[in-house]
Amino acid sequence: MYAGEFKQIGVTLNVRALKYSSKWYRWILPDLTWSIEEDEPRVYLTFDDGPHPEITPYVLDILDQHGFKASFFCIGDNVVKHPETYNEVLSRGHRVGNHTFNHLNGFQTNNSQYIDNVAKAAEVIDSTLFRPPYGRINDGQRGVVKKKYEIVMWDILTHDYSPRLNKSDCLQQITKLTKPGSIIVFHDSTKAQENLEYLLPKYCEFLAANKYISCQLP
């Protein structure tokens, strides 16, 4: 589970869980970026765990349909495996971020190994943005990473990776939570593919219909 995520008993993730699952984590880590102060109808779509040679291009095509830009937090190992897809993300005008080389859980990894893994990813991902996998990073790791990176979290986590997700309920809930400056997390990964292909087109249509645009993270 993601940091701060409530365990769900049933198959439906309710709006209260989506809204408050990271609230306590935001309270204890106010120095991380959870949303962007915005007066204009701008949001920040983000995608974790790619690049994937089939799913990432699908995402890029959906974004292009609406003229949206986004930020992709990439796993270094996937960049090495799929450099053409990674370069396509950049060539189509999107921003990238470091998501470690091997998708490490900071709560289960010693600090030295974690920092080395971030540095290994930096060899193939040129960025000043970092997002910890699962949202899990301890104090020691955070202190080192913050010297080189802005650590970007979220205020809307779609849970698209969950096989228990009720897709239609999730769509309704994430649209309710959307506000100017929201940072929204999707995943361009095999685990999330089915939910992503349902949610992303409809969510982008919602954004466009409500005069929102999606931009790269600043």
Predicted segments — roles?
Residues 28-31, 57, 79-90, 132-142, ...:
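Alpha-helical scaffolding within the catalytic cores
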Residues 60-69, 94-95, 101-104, 111-139, ...:
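CE4/NodB-like, metal-dependent polysaccharide N-deacetylase domain
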Residues 47-49, 74-76, 98-100, 132-134, ...:
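A cross-domain feature marking catalytic cores of carbohydrate-active enzymes
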Residues 44-47, 55-80, 87-90, 94-100, ...:
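Short, well-structured secondary-structure segments
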Residues 1-45, 51-65, 81-82, 202-206, ...:
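N-terminal pre-catalytic segment of deacetylase/amide-hydrolase enzymes
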